[in-house]
A protein has these predicted regions:
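ATP-dependent helicase/translocase motor core
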Residues: 5-78, 87, 91-103, 123-127, ...
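Conserved acidic residues
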Residues: 77, 126, 154, 197, ...
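Conserved AMP-binding/adenylation subdomain of ANL enzymes
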Residues: 102-107, 230
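Conserved motor-coupling elements within RecA-like helicase/translocase cores
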Residues: 112-128
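Conserved RecA-like ASCE ATPase "motif II neighborhood" in helicase/translocase motors
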Residues: 127-158, 163-187
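Post-DEXD/H (motif II) to motif III coupling segment of the RecA-like Helicase ATP-binding lobe
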Residues: 167-237
Length: 240
């Protein structure tokens, strides 16, 4: 892509100070490393990148830092952030609205960010948060007045989507969409494959069907390392 080399020049000038500001994102060393690994994969023209990060180590803030850098560098114009349940989407939007980035501005003050409630989006929408389920309905069942184009997004970030079917079964949410776990996986794969975009996925436990889509992790930060580093307490149920 033509904006790749220009973006890498901006990355160098950007530095990571904004992401490490104690009054802002306050990212830890491994979150910066995860972002760097994703940027490196994209600079090498890879179409997919998988980041494996233990539950409770701050995937949402990592994604926020990544999105900010990509938009600030002009590397991507329109980003779809796919989550596997509505509560995670709401939590993400709250983070995007609360965390101060450059010049004390939040992401949604700098860029047009549309949440789960916004079914449609304008041409100037830069970030769109949606559930896998909502896109299955729109793409496979045409449950919308406006169809999504394959090039509507140039980057898709997926958070823990391999858990979607299990959570749906537990919560009784959208169960009719999926006959069983294999059906969920095939529809999930169809949604991911539908878009002609770079794809970055974040997961706590890389399942086989996740690596089949996104490849082996380009960065891993596991539970044991997080405990040794003092960021997670052993045997405690970590916060999501």
């Amino acid at each position: 892509p033509s904006n790749s080399s220009a973006a890498s020049d901006v990355y160098k000038r950007q530095g990571y100070e904004v992401l490490q500001d104690p009054d802002g994102l306050n990212l830890r060393y491994y979150q910066i490393e995860a972002i760097q690994a994703a940027e490196k994969a994209i600079a090498e023209h890879k179409q997919t990148a998988l980041l494996a990060m233990a539950t409770g180590t701050g995937k949402t803030r990592t994604v926020l830092g990544m999105i900010y850098r990509f938009l600030d560098a002009g590397r991507f114009k329109r980003i779809l952030y796919l989550v596997d349940r509505t509560s995670l989407g709401d939590q993400t939007m709250d983070t995007f609205k609360e965390v101060k980035l450059k010049e004390l501005l939040t992401l949604n003050q700098m860029y047009d960010v549309k949440s789960l409630e916004d079914k449609e989006f304008e041409k100037d929408t830069r970030v769109h948060i949606a559930t896998v389920q909502s896109l299955v309905k729109r793409i496979m069942y045409n449950e919308s007045d406006k169809s999504l184009g394959v090039s509507d997004y140039d980057l898709i970030i997926v958070d823990e989507a391999h858990r979607g079917y299990i959570l749906d079964k537990e919560m009784g949410d959208d169960e009719v969409l999926y006959r069983d776990q294999n059906d969920f996986r095939s529809k999930y794969r169809a949604v991911i494959d539908y878009f002609d975009a770079v794809k970055i996925a974040l997961t706590a436990t890389p399942a086989l069907h996740t690596t089949e889509i996104f490849g082996k992790p380009v960065y891993s930060y596991d539970y044991r390392t997080a405990v040794i580093d003092g960021f997670l307490v052993d045997h405690d149920a970590p916060h999501i």
